[in-house]
Regions:
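Conserved anion-binding
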Residues: 77-143, 149-151
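Alpha-helix-loop-beta-strand connector modules within alpha/beta enzyme cores
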Residues: 27-51, 91-113, 160-180
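Distinct, well-ordered alpha-helical segments
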Residues: 30-31, 61-66, 124-133, 158-170, ...
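Non-cysteine beta-strand/loop elements that form the S-adenosyl-L-methionine
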Residues: 68-77, 113-117, 200-207
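Active-site mouth loops of central-metabolism enzymes
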Residues: 1-4, 47-55, 81-86, 118-132, ...
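Catalytic alpha/beta core domains of metabolic enzymes, predominantly
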Residues: 153-154, 158-212
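Glycine-rich, proline-tolerant flexible connector loops at the mouths of alpha/beta enzymes
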Residues: 15-40, 73-88, 118-124, 149-160, ...
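Glycine-rich, positively charged N-terminal anion/phosphate-binding segment
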Residues: 2-47, 53-61, 66
Length: 212
């Protein structure tokens, strides 16, 4: 069913799909077939197959299987990062550095993207300072990642604070590296998309029927 879904989406002109995740099977068993799915996705013409990874181990597995793009995830919120990947934020950034360095030594390099989750707030610790997010943006930009996904993981963003943060992110990393991920928790998902479009960013990370 997963492979059938991927083929159908590619026919609808989606150029990039996050096809699977290389995460511990004991924690997220539904990705037990990650290797099979990635191998099949790589056969689809005109599709960039990206893979979510939480650590260096997962990244190495994905790169060994020729993942065209690595989506590494960390959180601006310390509490959320600890709950999600069992690390503090600095440790996650250090591990991202290891992934970038590992990828650079490969004969066939993949694109490295990092998602900064809880960029507008956290369900565990509440408000997340824009300064914290911008500090992370500076660090990951310096590491040489190809893309940065500013993610409103819990849907706390509004057009005002979205524009404020993205303007400063653009100053650090430029428009070409940046894309956005919004949730519609408070009915502001589309309004936030428009706010970012007005700044000249045209790439968004989305899901199908709320799944993904």
């Amino acid at each position: 069913k997963k492979i059938k879904w991927l083929n159908k989406q590619s026919l609808l002109n989606f150029k990039e799909i996050e096809v699977t995740s290389f995460v511990p099977k004991k924690i997220v068993p539904q990705f037990f077939d990650a290797k099979i799915i990635l191998n099949e996705a790589n056969k689809i013409s005109n599709l960039t197959s990206s893979v979510l990874v939480p650590n260096l181990f997962g990244a190495k597995k994905a790169l060994e299987l020729n993942a065209q793009k690595i989506n590494y995830v960390l959180s601006a919120s310390e509490s959320h990062n600890k709950a999600n990947v069992n690390k503090d934020v600095n440790s996650s950034i250090n591990e991202l550095n290891e992934i970038v360095n590992y990828n650079n030594y490969l004969e066939k390099k993949s694109s490295i993207s990092v998602a900064i989750s809880t960029s507008f707030g956290c369900s565990i610790e509440g408000k997340v300072s824009p300064k914290k997010v911008l500090n992370i943006v500076e660090q990951v930009t310096h590491l040489g990642v190809d893309e940065i996904n500013i993610a409103d993981t819990v849907g706390y963003g509004n057009p005002y604070n979205v524009k404020y943060l993205f303007k400063h992110v653009i100053e650090i990393a430029g428009k070409d590296k940046i894309f956005a991920h919004f949730h519609d928790t408070r009915g502001l998902g589309l309004a936030n998309v428009i706010a970012v479009l007005e700044l000249g960013i045209f790439k968004f990370d989305s899901s199908l029927c709320g799944l993904g």
